[in-house]
Every structure is written in C-alpha cells, then in structure tokens.
From Swiss-Prot:
Upper lineage: Eukaryota, Viridiplantae, Streptophyta, Embryophyta, Tracheophyta
UniProt signal peptide: none
Organism superkingdom: Eukaryota
Subcellular locations according to the entry: Plastid, Chloroplast
MF term (GO), any: rRNA binding
Protein's UniProt keywords contain rRNA-binding: yes
Keywords: Chloroplast, Plastid, Ribonucleoprotein, Ribosomal protein, RNA-binding, rRNA-binding
Species whose genome carries this gene: Adiantum capillus-veneris
Name of the protein in question: Small ribosomal subunit protein uS8c
Amino acid sequence: MNNDAISTTVTSIRNANTKRKAMTRIPVTKMTRGIVQILLEEGFLKSVTEHTEGGKIFMDVKLRYFGKEKKPYVATIRYISKPGLRIYCDHIRIPKILGGMGIAILSTSYGLITDREARRRKTGGEILCHIW
C-alpha cells in the first residue's frame, strides 16, 4: 500500500472504474473517509460499508454506473495536490470543474468540503482532487 492515503483512494476508484468493477476496497483513514463521504453525497458512488479485517478497517465502496454499457458516473478523478507539491488557493481562485458539472475536494479549516461549499463559506484551502 502507498503511504499517501489520498492517492491510494483516487487510484483505487480510478482503476475499478476502468475495469468496470462493482466494488473496490479502500483502507480507512480520516482523510479517505471524508473523500468517500463527499463522493457518496454528490452521487458518484452507490454505497459504502466499513468492516474490519485482520485488525485493520477497510471500506467497501460500491461504484455507480449507468446505461447498458455500464458507463461510470466518475468519468475522471484526478489527484491534484501531491506530497511533493501542495496546491493551495483562496476562495476566489477555486477552479470550476467543467463549468460546475464536476467537483473539486478541498481540505480547509472546516474539514473536507467541495468547491461549491468553499465558495459559499468564502474559504480557501488545499485542492486535493478533481472529479467529473
């Protein structure tokens, strides 16, 4: 497993979507729990269940697809702020993803929130990832 929990989460979801898997397993941290919760609230995921296996907590994330071709709701998920290069912005410079069709997840003093919520609260933070 990678030492960076955010990249592990983003990569697991991206790989599962590419292979049209129904579910993926992600190790639980406060950060991964927050990211998955936002994706669930925004409708990109179907459901999430937590379970313990060998003393470690994991989340089983059920991915959401539509149509007969099983097209994923998460077309693209991109990791932005990396451990070697952190990306911060204030509320004025928060990017609109696909003109508001996608979301950006930010780590702020309010916790993990979407770009819309950050603009509404007029707060900036670290841009973790873009999803559309």
